[in-house]
């Protein structure tokens, strides 16, 4: 018998949002506007803090590469922003090299996310960027809210970035529908303990009254191990899931509309 679901936890990339959005819209926006952003914001406390955090990360990487054999980060040097003798243009060039290097290597460091978050906020507010969700997502959110089903987001993107995407979506602000957000500060998405922490934080009944929807079979496996109901999002453009045997042990949908035929949403 299918249990009643009263809490839905959603991934973003490949689930609520085309997986291409981040790589085709958000990341290119950073690359295209990084020089302008740094020059326009130069001297602001926000940018000073962003650069300080990037510099601290560079020092940590440099120290780690010296201490650990064959663990060379090769992170490009950032000049000391607190050294008054540092040439402004050379400092800017070093920051740009470092940021682009991290993005080229798909690094998800906290300082990089912080800078990106500030840039995306500016982009969204000035309508240079608009969040994208699949067409049926707003209706699903509305249906869940009407039936008193709580909606949470759990994504590797920062909570700030999550809120921007849903607040400035192509269907208007969807934030009022969402009760809460989680990112990797609560734990990695491949670890069952992360989902257990989320359950403990929400604290709204037994694990089998929750549904987690994701496009990642490894995330699905981790969530299931923590007791959640899980459904895989199989969307056009998502990376193919190679392990067909494991895939077939999960419910699968290609649209949120299909979730309402597979699960009982009742609170």
From Swiss-Prot:
GO biological process, alphabetically ordered: L-methionine salvage from methylthioadenosine
GO molecular function: acireductone synthase activity; magnesium ion binding
Positions contributing to substrate binding: 155-156, 189
Reactions catalysed: 5-methylsulfanyl-2,3-dioxopentyl phosphate + H2O = 1,2-dihydroxy-5-(methylsulfanyl)pent-1-en-3-one + phosphate
Record-listed E.C. numbers: 3.1.3.77
Cofactor(s) annotated in UniProt: Mg(2+)
Location in or out of the cell: Cytoplasm; Nucleus
Gene3D superfamilies found in the cross-reference section: 1.10.720.60, HAD superfamily/HAD-like
Main EC class the enzyme belongs to: hydrolase
Source organism, top-level taxon: Eukaryota
One Pfam family matching this protein: Hydrolase
Keywords, sorted A to Z: Amino-acid biosynthesis, Cytoplasm, Hydrolase, Magnesium, Metal-binding, Methionine biosynthesis, Nucleus
Binding site residues for Mg(2+): 11, 13, 215
Functional pathway: Amino-acid biosynthesis; L-methionine biosynthesis via salvage pathway; L-methionine from S-methyl-5-thio-alpha-D-ribose 1-phosphate: step 3/6; Amino-acid biosynthesis; L-methionine biosynthesis via salvage pathway; L-methionine from S-methyl-5-thio-alpha-D-ribose 1-phosphate: step 4/6
Annotated CDD domains: HAD_EP (cd01629)
Free-text cofactor note: Binds 1 Mg(2+) ion per subunit.
GO cellular component labels: cytoplasm; nucleus
Function: Bifunctional enzyme that catalyzes the enolization of 2,3-diketo-5-methylthiopentyl-1-phosphate (DK-MTP-1-P) into the intermediate 2-hydroxy-3-keto-5-methylthiopentenyl-1-phosphate (HK-MTPenyl-1-P), which is then dephosphorylated to form the acireductone 1,2-dihydroxy-3-keto-5-methylthiopentene (DHK-MTPene).
PANTHER family named in the record: ENOLASE-PHOSPHATASE E1
Subunit record text: Monomer.
Family, as annotated: Belongs to the HAD-like hydrolase superfamily. MasA/MtnC family.
Protein name per Swiss-Prot or TrEMBL: Enolase-phosphatase E1
Gene behind the chain: enoph1
